[in-house]
Amino acid sequence: MSRYRGPRLRIVRRIGKLPSLTNKTSKKRKSPGQPATSFKRKKKISKYNIRLKEKQKLRFNYGITERQLLNYVKKSRKKKGSSGRFLLTFLEMRLDNIVHRIGFAPTIMAAKQLINHGHICVDDKVINIPSFICQPKSIIKPKKSTVSENVIQKNIESKELLLIPPHLSLNKKNLEAKIIGLINRKAISLIVNELLVIEFYSRKV
Protein backbone atom coordinates (compact mmCIF):
# COMPACT_ATOMS: atom_id res chain seq x y z
CA MET A 1 0.00 0.00 0.00
CA SER A 2 1.43 3.40 -1.02
CA ARG A 3 1.56 6.57 1.06
CA TYR A 4 -1.60 8.65 1.32
CA ARG A 5 -1.41 11.82 -0.78
CA GLY A 6 -4.99 13.04 -0.49
CA PRO A 7 -6.57 15.79 1.67
CA ARG A 8 -5.00 15.73 5.13
CA LEU A 9 -8.01 17.05 7.02
CA ARG A 10 -10.09 14.17 5.71
CA ILE A 11 -7.76 11.79 7.54
CA VAL A 12 -7.80 13.93 10.70
CA ARG A 13 -11.61 13.87 10.73
CA ARG A 14 -11.56 10.11 10.46
CA ILE A 15 -8.91 9.08 12.99
CA GLY A 16 -8.07 12.15 15.09
CA LYS A 17 -5.25 14.63 15.52
CA LEU A 18 -2.02 13.81 13.66
CA PRO A 19 0.59 16.42 14.70
CA SER A 20 3.26 15.39 12.17
CA LEU A 21 0.87 15.21 9.21
CA THR A 22 -0.73 18.64 9.66
CA ASN A 23 -1.03 21.41 12.24
CA LYS A 24 -4.61 22.11 11.18
CA THR A 25 -7.57 20.80 13.13
CA SER A 26 -10.84 19.56 11.72
CA LYS A 27 -14.17 21.20 12.46
CA LYS A 28 -17.28 19.14 11.94
CA ARG A 29 -19.58 20.61 9.35
CA LYS A 30 -23.31 20.82 9.93
CA SER A 31 -25.74 20.15 7.14
CA PRO A 32 -28.18 22.98 6.24
CA GLY A 33 -31.25 22.82 8.50
CA GLN A 34 -29.54 20.49 10.95
CA PRO A 35 -30.46 21.32 14.58
CA ALA A 36 -27.77 22.59 16.94
CA THR A 37 -27.88 19.35 18.91
CA SER A 38 -28.76 16.00 17.46
CA PHE A 39 -28.69 12.66 19.17
CA LYS A 40 -27.38 9.74 17.17
CA ARG A 41 -27.03 6.20 18.29
CA LYS A 42 -23.39 5.28 18.44
CA LYS A 43 -22.52 2.13 16.59
CA LYS A 44 -20.55 -0.45 18.51
CA ILE A 45 -17.00 -0.48 17.21
CA SER A 46 -15.37 -3.88 16.80
CA LYS A 47 -12.00 -4.70 18.37
CA TYR A 48 -10.59 -5.09 14.87
CA ASN A 49 -11.64 -1.55 13.90
CA ILE A 50 -10.21 -0.13 17.13
CA ARG A 51 -6.84 -1.73 16.38
CA LEU A 52 -7.07 -0.67 12.74
CA LYS A 53 -7.59 2.95 13.76
CA GLU A 54 -4.49 2.91 15.99
CA LYS A 55 -2.48 1.36 13.18
CA GLN A 56 -3.66 4.04 10.75
CA LYS A 57 -2.62 6.75 13.20
CA LEU A 58 0.98 5.55 12.98
CA ARG A 59 0.89 5.17 9.21
CA PHE A 60 -0.44 8.64 8.50
CA ASN A 61 1.35 10.52 11.26
CA TYR A 62 4.77 9.19 10.24
CA GLY A 63 3.98 9.09 6.52
CA ILE A 64 4.94 5.46 5.99
CA THR A 65 3.60 2.62 3.89
CA GLU A 66 1.84 -0.50 5.13
CA ARG A 67 4.89 -2.59 4.28
CA GLN A 68 7.24 -0.27 6.18
CA LEU A 69 5.07 -0.37 9.28
CA LEU A 70 4.84 -4.16 9.14
CA ASN A 71 8.64 -4.39 8.90
CA TYR A 72 9.04 -2.14 11.95
CA VAL A 73 6.61 -4.33 13.88
CA LYS A 74 8.63 -7.43 12.94
CA LYS A 75 11.87 -5.81 14.11
CA SER A 76 10.22 -4.64 17.33
CA ARG A 77 8.93 -8.11 18.20
CA LYS A 78 12.47 -9.51 17.94
CA LYS A 79 13.71 -7.12 20.63
CA LYS A 80 13.72 -7.98 24.32
CA GLY A 81 11.28 -5.75 26.17
CA SER A 82 8.17 -3.83 25.15
CA SER A 83 7.50 -4.36 21.43
CA GLY A 84 5.26 -1.30 21.38
CA ARG A 85 7.97 0.91 22.87
CA PHE A 86 10.55 -0.33 20.33
CA LEU A 87 8.07 0.29 17.51
CA LEU A 88 7.64 3.94 18.51
CA THR A 89 11.40 4.33 18.93
CA PHE A 90 12.05 3.08 15.38
CA LEU A 91 9.52 5.54 14.00
CA GLU A 92 10.77 8.47 16.08
CA MET A 93 14.40 7.86 15.08
CA ARG A 94 13.68 7.98 11.36
CA LEU A 95 15.51 10.88 9.72
CA ASP A 96 12.33 12.42 8.29
CA ASN A 97 10.76 12.47 11.75
CA ILE A 98 13.87 13.96 13.36
CA VAL A 99 14.05 16.67 10.69
CA HIS A 100 10.43 17.54 11.42
CA ARG A 101 10.74 17.41 15.21
CA ILE A 102 13.75 19.78 15.31
CA GLY A 103 11.84 22.31 13.22
CA PHE A 104 13.71 21.99 9.92
CA ALA A 105 10.36 21.15 8.28
CA PRO A 106 6.76 22.03 9.31
CA THR A 107 5.35 18.57 8.50
CA ILE A 108 6.59 15.03 7.96
CA MET A 109 5.89 15.32 4.22
CA ALA A 110 7.92 18.53 3.98
CA ALA A 111 10.75 16.75 5.82
CA LYS A 112 10.70 13.91 3.29
CA GLN A 113 11.02 16.43 0.45
CA LEU A 114 13.99 18.16 2.07
CA ILE A 115 15.75 14.83 2.50
CA ASN A 116 14.90 13.53 -0.99
CA HIS A 117 16.30 16.73 -2.53
CA GLY A 118 19.60 16.32 -0.68
CA HIS A 119 19.27 19.26 1.72
CA ILE A 120 20.05 17.32 4.94
CA CYS A 121 23.34 16.06 6.37
CA VAL A 122 23.84 13.53 9.15
CA ASP A 123 27.32 13.68 10.67
CA ASP A 124 28.54 15.78 7.70
CA LYS A 125 27.26 13.29 5.13
CA VAL A 126 24.31 14.07 2.83
CA ILE A 127 21.54 11.53 3.42
CA ASN A 128 18.68 11.38 0.91
CA ILE A 129 16.78 8.47 2.46
CA PRO A 130 13.83 9.57 4.67
CA SER A 131 13.68 6.17 6.41
CA PHE A 132 17.33 6.37 7.51
CA ILE A 133 17.50 5.45 11.22
CA CYS A 134 19.44 8.03 13.20
CA GLN A 135 21.57 7.21 16.22
CA PRO A 136 22.17 9.03 19.52
CA LYS A 137 24.96 11.66 19.35
CA SER A 138 24.39 12.19 15.61
CA ILE A 139 24.49 15.77 14.30
CA ILE A 140 21.78 16.90 11.88
CA LYS A 141 22.27 20.04 9.81
CA PRO A 142 21.56 21.45 6.33
CA LYS A 143 23.91 20.83 3.45
CA LYS A 144 26.46 23.61 2.98
CA SER A 145 24.55 25.56 0.36
CA THR A 146 22.70 28.86 0.43
CA VAL A 147 19.51 27.23 -0.85
CA SER A 148 19.45 24.51 1.82
CA GLU A 149 20.30 26.89 4.65
CA ASN A 150 17.73 29.50 3.58
CA VAL A 151 14.90 26.95 3.35
CA ILE A 152 15.63 25.55 6.79
CA GLN A 153 16.15 28.98 8.36
CA LYS A 154 12.73 30.04 7.10
CA ASN A 155 11.11 26.91 8.56
CA ILE A 156 12.76 27.36 11.95
CA GLU A 157 11.42 30.91 12.20
CA SER A 158 7.86 29.68 11.65
CA LYS A 159 5.48 30.09 14.60
CA GLU A 160 3.68 26.83 13.83
CA LEU A 161 6.49 24.50 14.88
CA LEU A 162 6.00 21.81 17.49
CA LEU A 163 7.96 21.90 20.73
CA ILE A 164 11.31 20.17 20.38
CA PRO A 165 11.36 17.02 22.57
CA PRO A 166 14.05 16.77 25.29
CA HIS A 167 16.04 14.02 23.53
CA LEU A 168 16.88 16.52 20.78
CA SER A 169 18.72 19.85 20.95
CA LEU A 170 18.83 22.65 18.39
CA ASN A 171 21.32 25.46 17.90
CA LYS A 172 19.28 27.93 15.85
CA LYS A 173 22.25 30.20 15.20
CA ASN A 174 24.35 27.44 13.64
CA LEU A 175 21.37 25.55 12.17
CA GLU A 176 22.64 22.42 13.88
CA ALA A 177 20.75 19.80 15.88
CA LYS A 178 22.00 16.94 18.02
CA ILE A 179 20.32 13.70 19.02
CA ILE A 180 21.01 13.45 22.74
CA GLY A 181 19.47 10.01 23.21
CA LEU A 182 16.36 7.92 22.61
CA ILE A 183 12.96 9.54 23.01
CA ASN A 184 10.95 9.14 26.20
CA ARG A 185 7.44 7.75 25.70
CA LYS A 186 5.91 10.84 27.33
CA ALA A 187 7.57 13.12 24.75
CA ILE A 188 5.76 11.52 21.81
CA SER A 189 3.16 14.02 20.63
CA LEU A 190 0.88 11.51 18.91
CA ILE A 191 -1.91 10.05 21.07
CA VAL A 192 -1.82 6.36 20.18
CA ASN A 193 -2.03 2.94 21.82
CA GLU A 194 0.99 1.22 20.30
CA LEU A 195 0.15 -2.13 21.92
CA LEU A 196 -3.04 -2.32 19.86
CA VAL A 197 -0.92 -1.87 16.74
CA ILE A 198 1.26 -4.82 17.76
CA GLU A 199 -1.92 -6.84 18.35
CA PHE A 200 -3.27 -5.85 14.93
CA TYR A 201 -0.26 -7.45 13.25
CA SER A 202 -0.03 -10.44 15.61
CA ARG A 203 -1.24 -12.89 12.96
CA LYS A 204 0.95 -11.43 10.23
CA VAL A 205 4.26 -11.56 12.09
Curated annotation (Swiss-Prot):
Domain S4 RNA-binding intervals: 93-161
Main location as per UniProt: plastid
Subcellular location: Plastid, Chloroplast
SUPFAM superfamilies: Alpha-L RNA-binding motif
Stretches the record annotates as Disordered: 16-40
GO annotation, cellular component aspect: chloroplast; small ribosomal subunit
Record Gene3D superfamilies: Ribosomal Protein S4 Delta 41, Chain A, domain 1 (1.10.1050.10), RNA-binding S4 domain (3.10.290.10)
Keyword annotations from UniProtKB, A to Z: Chloroplast, Plastid, Ribonucleoprotein, Ribosomal protein, RNA-binding, rRNA-binding
GO biological process terms, semicolon-separated: ribosomal small subunit biogenesis; translation
A Gene Ontology molecular function term of the record: rRNA binding
Subunit structure: Part of the 30S ribosomal subunit. Contacts protein S5. The interaction surface between S4 and S5 is involved in control of translational fidelity.
Family: Belongs to the universal ribosomal protein uS4 family.
Protein known as: Small ribosomal subunit protein uS4c
